[in-house]
Curated annotation (Swiss-Prot):
This protein binds to 23S rRNA in the presence of protein L20. The keyword rRNA-binding applies. This is Large ribosomal subunit protein bL21. Part of the 50S ribosomal subunit. Contacts protein L20. InterPro entries: bL21-like (IPR028909), bL21-like_sf (IPR036164), Ribosomal_bL21 (IPR001787), Ribosomal_bL21_CS (IPR018258). GO terms for cellular component: cytoplasm; ribonucleoprotein complex; ribosome.
Amino acid sequence: MKSYAIIQTGSKQYQVSEGDIIDVELLDGVSEGQEIVFDQVLFTFDGSKVSLGTPTVKNAVVKGELLSRVRGEKVIAYKYKRRKNYHRKIGHRQNYLRVKISNLVM
């Protein structure tokens, strides 16, 4: 089986393997092409051995490369009050970082 890890970043958890491309919440102080290290590894599987962290796995890191900054799909919030001619339409697009996972160190 293929090795994978579960990491936590931006209050979300992602299951990643080498070569995966994921969109994560914005991180401070990173630029395109720069290496990103995710040190909050909650779970690892290397094909035969399972490591479960309490809360994180010791000495396990996931390294990735920042590919680009992307924006998510537009979310529309619409509210109105009937018979009062009141309505508001608000749109929001979340900013993300697109990261390619390059290495799992277990």
